[in-house]
Structures are given as C-alpha cells and as structure tokens.
A protein has these predicted regions:
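Extended non-globular scaffold/tether segments
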Residues: 200-211
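Conserved catalytic cores of very large enzyme subunits
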Residues: 2-202, 231, 235-238, 242-788
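A conserved hydrophobic secondary-structure block that centers on an alpha-helix together
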Residues: 223-232
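Secondary-structure-rich domain cores
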Residues: 213-220
Length: 788
C-alpha cells in the first residue's frame, strides 16, 4: 500500500511547516508560578503546574488527522522550558536568524519574553542554579571543551516505555497510587512523608492527562457537529470515542493503542524537555496483539492499520527538538529529537521477536521517509534473514534508516549491568545507540567527553594550548618521557582527573533535579517509582544508570599510534619535533604531515599495532569510570557516540600528531578517522570488534557505501552478511550512508536542488542541507566503500 490522499496531505503539511518557537508553555508556566499554589511540596507543585499546562494549552485537531495532539499550539511549534533554561533576548535573536536549525521567533513572542518571561525567570532557572553550583575546575574544563553537560538546558529522562500502558489505563495507576498511600506507615517509615508527596503528585499528574484527553474528545465532538462531510463526521466521532477511552482506560484496539501512546508521549515531553525524547521502544511487539485481534474480529485490515501508523509517524515529525543554544546546540545541532522505535529482536522468553507487525512497520518507514521517528532493527541470531533483507532494501534507498543493533549483545550488556534476564530481554536501544531496560530504568546521559583534548592537555603538561590556561595536572614535560608507557601513564592521570571533575559535577546536578525539578508524570510510567514512592529523578526507577559519552576514539587512537610508532619505536622524530609541528599547525611541515597521515598504522584497517592502542584507550576510559556510584542508587557507565559533538570538540582541539589540522572535526563514534580506513568495510569491522562492546552502554559505527554497491540482490545480500558478521564478532551497532561524494558536493553547491537529500549523521538521520558546513565536510570526508 502506498500513502492515501489523507496521509500525503498530512505528510506534506508536516514537511512544509516552519519550525517556530512558541511562548505558550512558558507563558502558562509563568502565570502558574505567579499565582504560587501556596506552601506545597516540590513534587506536588510540579504536578499542579503540569495540570495547569494541560488544562490551559491550546488544542486542535487538524484536517484529516486520525491521531491527535501536539506539544505546541500547532505542528512544528516548539515550546520552551524557562524553569530549566530561560532564553535571553540575544538567544531568541540568534535562534531566529541563524542559518541552520533556526526557529522563527515572532515579534509578539519576543515581546512576551522581554516583558514577562525573562523578568520572572532570569536567575531562577535550573541552568542558572547549575552553573552557580559548579566548581572553578568544572567551569574551566567545560569552557575548554573537555566535556559537555546534557542537563544544562534539557532535563534528564532518557528512557523508554514498556508495555504497561497497553494493559493499564491511568485510572488503574491512580488506584495503585491510592493503595500505596493508604499503606504508608508514618510510625515506622521515616520516609513516609516524602513518599506521600511524590505519590500525591503522581496522582495529580495521572488525573491531568485524563483531563487533557477529555479536552480532545470534546473538541472532536464539537467538530463532528459542524463538519459537512459524513465520512469525516464519522471519523471525528470515532476520535472522540478513542480519546474518552485512552489513556484513562487501557486501549481496546489498534487505534486506541496508538493514541494512548501519543497522549503519554505528549505528557512526558510537555512536563519537561527530556533528553532524549521519550521513546515507544518495541512498538511491533506492543501492537501485535491489537493487530491480530482486529484481523480476527474483522474490525481492522492491513491497509487501515498502515494508514493509522502513517498518521502516527507524522505526529513525531511535527515535534522538533526544543531550541538549543551555545554548547548544547553545538553538541546536538539538529531538529531531530531521537525518539527511536525498536523492531525485531528477542522476546522476554528468548524467542524470535519478529512478527507480521514488524514488516508492516518497515513498510511504513520506507513509505513515510521522515526523519522522525528514528528506527532500528534489533538483530538476533534467532531472527530470519528475511527480516534483515527487508531492512536492507530500505537502507539502500539512502535514507539512513533503519540502523542495526545486536540484540543478543544488548542482553549481555544489560545483564552485566545488573538487570535480570527478563528485564534485559525487554530492553533495547534508544536515542542514538544507548541501551536500557525499557520501562524500568532511568539511564541518564550526562554529556560528551573529549578524549583527544585530554591527550592534548597531557602533551602540554596540564596546560590548554588554546587558552594558555593551566587546567589539568602537571604530569610532566612530555619531551622528557623515555617511553610510550610514561606518556600513557600521564594520559591516564589526566583522564582520571577530568572524569573526577565531570562526575563530581553530575553528582550535584542529579541532586538539583531531584530536589527542585521532580517529574511526577514520567515517574508514574517507570517501574518502580510508584512502589518506592520516589521520583524518577531521585532513584525511583528499578535501575538507575549514568552514562558519559566518549568522543574521538579513532582520533586518539591514531594520535597515540603516531607518537608510539614514530617517536618511541621507529625513533624517526623526537617529541620536541612533534610538538613544534603541531604548535604551528604543520605550516612548513607538510612532508612530515603526509608521513603521519600515510606512513603510520591507522585504526580501522585490522592492524593490530593501532588496534592494540585503541584497546588500551578503551580500557583506560572504562576503568576510570565504570562502576562509580551515582546519587540515585545506580552506577556510571561508558558509551561511545558523538551526535554532532565531534565537530564542536574538534573546533576546540588544535593540530594533533596523527596529521589532523587544528580545529577540524574529530572522528565520530567508534568509526575510524575520516579517510583513514583504506582496506574496506570488513577490516573496519575487525578493528572495531577488538574492543569489548559488552562492557559499554552503546557504541556507534558509521559506514558509507556507494549506491552502486547495493544496487542489485548480490549487494543486498552482502550487506546482510556484513551485519551478521559484525554481530557474530560482538559488535554493538552499525549504520549506513548510501550516497556518493559527487552527490554530496553538488548538494553543497546547489542546496535548493537537494532539499530532500537525507544522510546518516551519528545516531540519527538529517537533511544534508540542514547541516553545518563543517558537518557536511566531515560526512563527505568519510571513506566511501565501493566493495565489501
């Protein structure tokens, strides 16, 4: 089935809509806090604010819509969250005027900010408090580009829904909360009062989302009275019935299941601007019972289900990521908000998770060709090749979706972190490549960590050469190091020092969110927040992980390899000579630079010399971070991914001993340095598989193929076997760009002719013409493979 006329119109309207900054949420929230509900606890205050938002925000049902609800007043209207980050007038002007990832800011919106929102929130936002609480050491490292902080402009909440909302309605949650409240023991439980307030807040939040859906039901009823077309009148009456049923009660059919999720998604992302966006998780397995039931009863056919899913897809595409500025915009410069749908994998009993709904969803992904939602295939040894082949046919269209994950390895990763086997099998990937136990875990991404920058500071005895400031430890003049072991030991000391600073900061930030910014609606959706009477931000979830995302693994590997190979092994140059060359960005030393680029072992070529150093960096990073306790009762873990932060981190890192020029991008994910992999994709997979992916919470590997390679069935089968091979080698994730360099260069020169060109950036797809020039050039520079 292709798109119906309804879907074509809705899809085009979504694509044509302009990303606009909406002041609606900020105005309503400010009005609520002006009123101040009296002496109530922080969780209850946040729940009352949530209720106020849902009672007063504008609602609308667009022409032809079957799935209803928007975060803002209209599609592509992005709300703001001044309690977290209050944008200045300068921020608004920048958002309105910048060339890429801009948001239209109307004069009326700017005036509201100037007269109402900024005067109330300036100095009071959590971002203001966060920066006030950070140490001088943290500030220096942050400003130098050692790390970023995810929670300075967006809330934690990187989590995924399980199947509970498909079996239970909000009234069931409220009944459970009432039971927990009645059972509180104030005589013997010293935390009873805190639990009471959190449970009361969850109850208010659950009631609020029911009221919100009823507003939509009433809107549909009113529209039905006015519309002349009998078919649309019937649809609106059905929408009213759906919205009266869910999410108050459990969904009874396929349509209600989709609408139930969408109301929950809106609730989570209206409450706070969770990073990454809330995700549906294993949508195929959640929808399969409703699909089969509809077919058996004769109330649903495949075409109807497909149209509903297509309408569902459009709702995701209508929601741009919240406006970002500063470092946060640099580390994640995209409209995409990373809501990922998992397909396939294995069920909780360990059996094959592929169903007829899996293939239906793959058809929808190919037909819709939208950036959001993101999609992934979860590949298990138990899945049929037909499943991967179907996904491969989509990949070869050059859409960048779906990405591929090793479902069997993800289970190992989660079990290693302490999850039960059942919870691990119900987990998967979200955001870019991060893993968690769906519906049961708060796995917070804390920010990116610049591995090559730490080495750069090591090579300057703790000084940042960009600013001239001493921000690290004095680990010794590297010209005096007699061996690679001395150099690596100095790097490990700096690495531990900066990770200590990063973790200390995040311990404080976690408490700030737990204390001042509870999330009662998100909390009631995640086990075991109700049972514990604790907020999602305060360790209420069954599992609570904190991730730090390492960036530039390929770059730091090649840098250390060059130092070891040329200075300590071959002795073809001295450390002093190397430092002199990078200090002047290789000006006057192009011959030596070409030697570093072309006559040095490189990661990504199945070369044990370079790959062995990669393993040492991996082990150093893992040992310095993994297993540290966070404040929520969980532990810190590593993962390796960049979003767009390898561009930002490169812009603050000078020339490096691998031949890289100053201020240019670092390598992305666990991919080799751009252009350094010269022995084909199989060699890349061999190199990447030499790290222990099972000890991470996610690794990201990009590959770029020519369209000609995948043009026939033999090419498709080669891609299927490449994915299978990498996962046999225990790789975590792989994704593909299928586009040639010539097309990308033409798109740079004539963007108006290539507005629909989509590429895979990091853990997401984006329009090539929406990317910064630096990011466009980085994607062009990635090695293009014409053979397997």
């Amino acid at each position: 089935m292709s798109m119906t006329e309804r879907v074509r119109k809705l899809r085009q309207a979504s694509l044509d809509a302009e990303e606009t900054l909406s002041s609606e949420r900020a105005e309503l929230l400010t009005a609520f806090y002006w009123q101040e509900p009296g002496p109530v606890s922080a969780p209850v205050r946040r729940a009352l604010a949530f209720r106020y938002l849902l009672e007063h925000k504008a609602i609308s049902i667009g022409e032809g819509e079957l799935i209803v609800g928007e975060k803002g007043p209209a599609p592509k209207n992005a709300p703001t969250y001044p309690e977290l980050c209050c944008h200045s007038l300068e921020d608004l002007d920048l958002l309105n005027s910048r060339e890429k990832i801009s948001f239209k800011v109307s004069p009326e919106t700017r005036q509201v900010y100037e007269q109402t929102i900024i005067p109330f929130w300036q100095g009071k936002s959590l971002r203001d408090l966060l920066f006030r609480e950070m140490t001088d050491e943290w500030q220096a490292a942050y400003e130098a580009g050692i790390f970023t902080e995810f929670m300075e402009q967006r809330a934690p909440g990187h989590t995924v829904l399980d199947d509970k909302i498909y079996h239970r309605g909000m009234l069931d949650f409220i009944a459970e909360i009432e039971t927990r409240l009645e059972a509180l023991d104030f005589l013997h439980d010293l935390g009873a009062y805190s639990k009471q307030e959190e449970l009361r807040a969850m109850r208010i939040a659950a009631e609020a989302i029911v009221g919100f859906s009823e507003r939509y039901a009433e809107e549909a009823r009113q529209q039905a009275k006015k519309v002349a077309d009998p078919k649309r009148r019937s649809e609106l009456k059905q929408i009213a019935e759906v919205c009266s049923q869910v999410p108050a009660h459990a969904p009874r059919n396929f349509w209600e299941a989709l609408q139930a999720y969408w109301f929950v998604h809106l609730g989570v992302t209206i409450e706070l601007n969770t990073w990454d966006s809330f995700c549906p998780g294993h949508l195929d397995r959640h929808l399969t019972p409703f699909y089969r039931q509809g077919l058996e009863e004769g109330t649903l056919n495949r075409e109807q289900a497909e149209e509903l899913l297509q309408c569902f897809w459009i709702k995701f595409n209508n929601q741009p990521a919240p406006p970002k500025v500063g470092v946060t915009a640099a580390e994640s410069g995209t409209y995409t908000d990373f809501a990922q749908i998992n397909l396939g994998g294995i069920l909780e009993d360990g059996s094959d998770g592929v169903s007829e709904v899996t293939y239906l969803l793959l058809d929808v992904i190919e037909e819709m060709r939208l950036l959001q939602p993101s999609s992934s295939i979860q590949v298990s040894k138990k899945n049929p090749d037909r499943f991967i082949q179907r996904a491969a046919r989509i990949i070869r269209t050059g859409f960048g979706q779906p990405s591929a994950f090793n479902a069997d390895l993800i289970v190992q990763e989660l079990v290693r972190m302490g999850k039960t086997m059942e919870d691990a099998r119900s987990g998967g990937s979200s955001g870019c490549v991060e893993v968690g136990a769906f519906g049961k875990e708060a796995y917070i991404l804390t920010g990116y960590f610049n591995l090559p920058k730490v080495l750069e500071i090591t090579l300057h005895n703790g000084r940042d050469p960009r600013s001239g400031k001493q921000i690290g430890l004095e680990t010794g003049d590297p010209t005096g190091f007699q061996s690679f072991e001395e150099l690596f030991a100095a790097f490990e000391k700096q690495l531990l020092y900066f990770l200590d600073i990063k973790v200390r900061g995040n311990q404080v930030i976690e408490r700030l969110y737990a204390t001042f910014m509870p999330a009662p609606f998100l909390s009631l959706l995640i086990n075991d927040c109700i049972a514990r009477g604790r907020d999602y931000h305060d360790g209420g979830a069954r599992y609570n992980s904190s991730y730090v995302q390492g960036v530039g693994l390929g770059s730091i590997t090649d840098i250390l390899t060059a130092l070891n190979y040329h200075i300590y092994d071959r002795k073809s140059m001295t450390m002093a000579q190397m430092l002199s060359m990078i200090e002047v960005d290789f000006v006057g030393f192009e011959r030596e630079r070409q030697k570093l680029l072309n006559k040095t072992p490189k990661y990504g070529n199945d070369d044990d010399y370079a790959d062995g150093i990669m393993r040492r960096v991996f082990e150093a990073y893992f040992n310095a971070l993994d297993g540290r306790k966070n404040t929520r009762g969980g532990e810190y873990r590593i993962n390796l991914l960049p979003t767009t932060c390898h561009i930002y981190f490169g812009s603050v890192t000078g020339a490096t001993p691998d031949g890289r020029k100053a201020w240019t991008p670092l390598s992305e994910g666990i991919s080799p340095v751009q252009g350094a992999d010269r022995h084909g994709p199989t060699a890349v997979l061999q190199s990447a598989s030499k790290m222990d992916h099972a000890r991470t919470g996610g690794t990201l590997l990009n590959q770029k193929f020519t369209p000609q390679l995948l043009a026939d069935d033999a090419g498709l089968e080669g891609l299927v076997q490449l994915i299978r091979t990498y996962f046999i080698l225990d790789g975590h994730h792989i994704q593909f760009n299928v586009v040639d360099v010539a097309t990308l260069r033409l798109a740079q020169k004539h963007p108006e002719e290539y507005r629909d060109l989509i590429v895979r950036v990091a853990g997401y797809s984006d329009y090539f013409c929406d990317l910064s020039e630096a990011l466009q050039n980085e994607i062009i520079a990635r090695t293009e493979h014409g053979t397997f």
